[in-house]
Structure formats: structure tokens, C-alpha cells
């Protein structure tokens, strides 16, 4: 017999709606909420700042994470799997989409501004996410989304800024010179 314990079973969704709602729950808890919490809890921010310290945001930035951050995101994702009661196939689909969107969000590509604006009502676009990589507040604490942009709009964390005004990196001008071990030690350095 099948154990039904998640939100999807309570709502009795099947087929496409089940897949879509599962993806949305996984994205909300496993990406948006995890990302938001990493910005709000100082020890987690000290780990996440490794990602933000990149002064040249591109697709490599999407892969620039401290191993501790990967563990934190894993915990949130596992919780999201239980809440959504997602099948392994849906989890694989979500993880695949997450990787694609993370690369897309950090890519140095410029979409037609009208198309970008329309697209950003549904999904996170590079222009939208790059505001999040601005080195100064309040922009750093906006646009947390990974796949769906609805979360930032719904929770008031959406922000726009002209791309020419964005300065990448962190406000402390930390420069790791791409030294792998220096990057790994960054969360533990004394100020």
C-alpha cells in the first residue's frame, strides 16, 4: 500500500497538477526559502558569501558554493520532498531544472528587454537574478528565486535595477584571487 503523507495527497492532485505543484513546492522550500534563510542567519550567510564574492558573475558563479552550503540546501530539499510527497522522478526533474535555471540565471546573456520582462513574471531571468548579485544592500537581499519568480513577487523580495548600475562582489571588496583553499576558509576568517 502507498503511504500518503504529503501536501499533494491532502489536495488530491494527480497528473500535470501533481507534477507542477511538486516542482513549485520543491522550488519554494529547496531553493527560495533556503536562499532567503542563508541571507538572514549570519553563520549561514558567512558560508553563502562564497557564492556572492565572485566579482565576475557568469555560469561558473552558479557552481561556486561552499560545501557547507550544499549540505544546508540538501536539508531544505529533503524537507521539501517530504512536504510535497514528490516521487524520485519528480525530484530528478526538479534537480535537473534547477541546474539548468541556475546556469541560465548566472549566464552573461542579454535577452530582449521586453521578452525578459514578460518572462520574468513566470521564471527567474539573468537580468532579474543579477540584481541579487549587486554588492550593496538592499539589492543583495532581493531576487532569491531559482526557477519560479513568483516567490520574490509574492513575498516582497523582488527588485529591479538598471544592469549598468550593478557592481558584483561583496561590500567588503573581498578578493580571493580564485584561490580554492582561500575560498573554502572564507566563512571562518576573523574580521
Predicted regions and their residues:
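Membrane-embedded catalytic scaffold of the fatty acid hydroxylase/desaturase
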Residues: 1, 8-9, 13-167
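A membrane-cytosol interface segment of integral membrane proteins
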Residues: 165-191
Amino acid at each position: 500500500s502507498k503511504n500518503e503523507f504529503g501536501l499533494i495527497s491532502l489536495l488530491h492532485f494527480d497528473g500535470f497538477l501533481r507534477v507542477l505543484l511538486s516542482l513549485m513546492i520543491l522550488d519554494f522550500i529547496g531553493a527560495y526559502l533556503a536562499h532567503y534563510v542563508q541571507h538572514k542567519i549570519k553563520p549561514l550567510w558567512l558560508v553563502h558569501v562564497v557564492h556572492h564574492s565572485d566579482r565576475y558573475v557568469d555560469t561558473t558563479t552558479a557552481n561556486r558554493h561552499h560545501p557547507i552550503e550544499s549540505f544546508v540546501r540538501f536539508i531544505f530539499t529533503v524537507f521539501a520532498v517530504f512536504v510535497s510527497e514528490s516521487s524520485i522522478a519528480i525530484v530528478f526533474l526538479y534537480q535537473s531544472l534547477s541546474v539548468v535555471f541556475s546556469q541560465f540565471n548566472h549566464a552573461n546573456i542579454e535577452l530582449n528587454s521586453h521578452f525578459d520582462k514578460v518572462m520574468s513574471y513566470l521564471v527567474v531571468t539573468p537580468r532579474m537574478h543579477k540584481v541579487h548579485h549587486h554588492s550593496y544592500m538592499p539589492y543583495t537581499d532581493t531576487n532569491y528565486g531559482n526557477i519560479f519568480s513568483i516567490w520574490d513577487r509574492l513575498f516582497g523580495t523582488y527588485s529591479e535595477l538598471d544592469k549598468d548600475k550593478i557592481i558584483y562582489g561583496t561590500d567588503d571588496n573581498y578578493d580571493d584571487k580564485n584561490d580554492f583553499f582561500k575560498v573554502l576558509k572564507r566563512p571562518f576568517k576573523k574580521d
